């Protein structure tokens, strides 16, 4: 298996009380190190890794899974277990073999909190 794509997976859950964006750095294969340049998506937008959350796929939380967005947001304090949704036109979630198990990466435009039950838009 190379990878499995889950097009309907969009949910993430807070695993820390602080949720924040950090820039995704470019990895230089020859130097075997990260350089100061920030990675971009296929549309040229800068990528941000969201720290403090884990992807949820088929009701399973992928601790250590990565969540990446293109819209930066200021750090926020939330209760552990708070659910968010990765939103945007091109949200993807993929699961792949990794050392010692499975890895997971979810990417999209932004992180939003889902509406609460009974809330109207």
Where are these regions (language model features)?
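OB-fold and OB-like single-stranded nucleic-acid-recognition modules
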Residues: 1-121
